[in-house]
Regions:
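Flavin-dependent oxidoreductases
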Residues: 56-124
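C-terminal catalytic lobe of FAD-dependent flavoproteins
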Residues: 116-117, 126, 145-150, 154-231
Length: 231
């Protein structure tokens, strides 16, 4: 990590209720609040609700209430829904993961993410601990919530479970998001998707890449090219 230019250190003692071999610690980090972030951005935007796009062309979005025309169009719909171009239905697969909110328990100091695939994540918010984990291909694991509840009872036996959520993420074939032109035949239609478990990070990278493409016609972050080699 340090060779990539990020300040980090290896620590052996961590504030967790289970044993670890150690952890990579990143200093001077902040805890991100996505709703406050979105609310601040939305102040300068016009957001049209209850207007699902029924059909899409390169320059038009057609809805039940009318059409919207634009010189540049970005499809940022979690899953790219235009199938006749791009063929994203064969370039993406779905994964599901789970989160529980716990109260009446000690909240670890910091934000933690287990390195192994499907491992646990922990972060606090006020008097609540958010415990996430149990990742699997969608449709392959019928009792993901129950398995996460078992982990909660094991590591936080006194905690009260006050809420639960499931997330479904679009995964790419190589782990990097698809950002750029929707297809080779659509110079003014763009896409951002396949963020995996890193939606906020992927969204910020997409904003940088697509703003450059729309304004300057060039892409400065080549690894995210959609027509890249993935095997």
């Amino acid at each position: 990590v340090m060779q990539l230019g990020f300040p980090a250190e290896y620590v052996e003692q961590v504030d967790l209720p289970f044993e670890t071999a150690g952890a990579v610690r990143f200093p001077n980090q902040a805890q991100f609040h996505p709703l406050k972030f979105v609310a601040a951005i939305a102040k300068n935007l016009n957001i049209y609700e209850h207007s699902p796009v029924r059909e899409m062309t390169e320059y038009f979005a057609l809805t039940d209430h009318g059409s919207v025309a634009a010189e540049k169009v970005i499809v940022a719909t979690h899953f790219p829904f235009i199938n006749r171009r791009g063929s994203y239905f064969v370039k993406l697969y779905q994964e599901r993961s789970y989160v529980l909110s716990l109260k009446n328990t000690e909240i670890p100091d910091g934000i933690y993410l287990e390195a192994k695939k499907g491992g646990l994540s922990l972060r606090g918010y006020e008097d609540t601990l958010l415990l996430g984990g149990i990742t699997h291909r969608t449709g392959k694991e019928p009792d993901g919530f129950e398995k996460l509840r078992e982990q909660a009872k094991l590591y936080f036996p006194e905690a009260e479970i006050t809420g639960q959520w499931a997330a479904q993420d679009c995964m790419t074939l190589d782990g990097l998001p698809y950002i750029g032109n929707y297809s080779s035949s659509t110079p003014d239609l763009f896409v951002a998707g396949g963020f995996g478990k890193w939606g906020m990070t992927g969204a910020m990278i997409s904003a940088i890449v697509l703003s450059d493409l729309c304004r300057e016609g060039k892409m400065n972050l080549q690894p995210f090219l959609i027509r890249r080699e993935v095997f």
